[in-house]
């Protein structure tokens, strides 16, 4: 996929519109985790070093009524970004209007301005939920596009699966849209892994629900050499095989689909053989390992030791690994072992030359919490976006980037 990147643009003296993903957790004005802000720094710094004027757009949270606005201002993010860049970030606190336009006109080369939360535009002056941003209102996309010099850099992979005014809307009103470094990296690793992998290619899928991952399982079964399924969703497959699952979470309406997938997949699909179970959903209760089924009154909350070994054997020698979703309830220490062991093992394959990609969402949180994030080739910043990419879908935010 050869898309235009920020390095292909002449930025000197230009007002460069940039979509970043600064949708970070904020409590009482304090940012909880600034990973997304830090991830955008290389692209922002590059634009400034090239003598461009960076005009940043991002959403923060969801805004459905006027009362949502004050707690979801990007002001704390602008302040934090100015600390990280060691320079002022101009923040007029507006999404449109004369004050914003004047502030942009006053920018000098190498300066940064942040537009207020783009989702402020989802609620109008009368408090009506009009979704101008998230509904990709054509007038808003054109208005924002006109604030710059016909250049747009999209570095927000986390919103690439959405068609909003601040990504697709701006892109459709400028002649050149380029990928920022973060977007470029995401496309490179996910695209290569799914469409041109070094083999053997093993996909590892976890998480609670089969329904969330059906399309991913189907797409990856057609591309990977093996697909490992663990986590809560594996109990729907166990039930479909006629194995007792006790009180474990499963989706009754997906059992026939699980049967169908198993029949089509044959030995390509690798499923757990044992579980760590408890009598209630809590960390401080006695646990037991069950093989070949879980008795009534017990619920499976992590993969067991035999399964860990089985999955490691499947992964041995893999040259590409895509991992999406934890193997158990990793937030509770008693049920984190499967995710930790498998994570460490996948991490060790990186040093043997494998491309190891963690595909967003819970698995990203898991590797960070377990302190093993630095052991992988690439950790995706997009939850829903990486999932849809792994499903084989075309993401509107990426489709809107100009081809070289």
Curated annotation (Swiss-Prot):
ATP binds at residues 213, 300, 331, 360-363. Its EC number is 2.7.2.3. It catalyses: (2R)-3-phosphoglycerate + ATP = (2R)-3-phospho-glyceroyl phosphate + ADP. Signal peptide: none annotated. The keyword Iron does not apply. Keywords: ATP-binding, Cytoplasm, Glycolysis, Kinase, Nucleotide-binding, Transferase. It is found in: Cytoplasm. Its main location: cytoplasm. Pfam families: PGK. It comes from the Bacteria. HAMAP family: Phosphoglyc_kinase (MF_00145). Monomer. Belongs to the phosphoglycerate kinase family. This is Phosphoglycerate kinase. It comes from Oenococcus oeni (strain ATCC BAA-331 / PSU-1). The lineage of its organism: Bacteria, Bacillati, Bacillota, Bacilli, Lactobacillales. The gene is pgk.
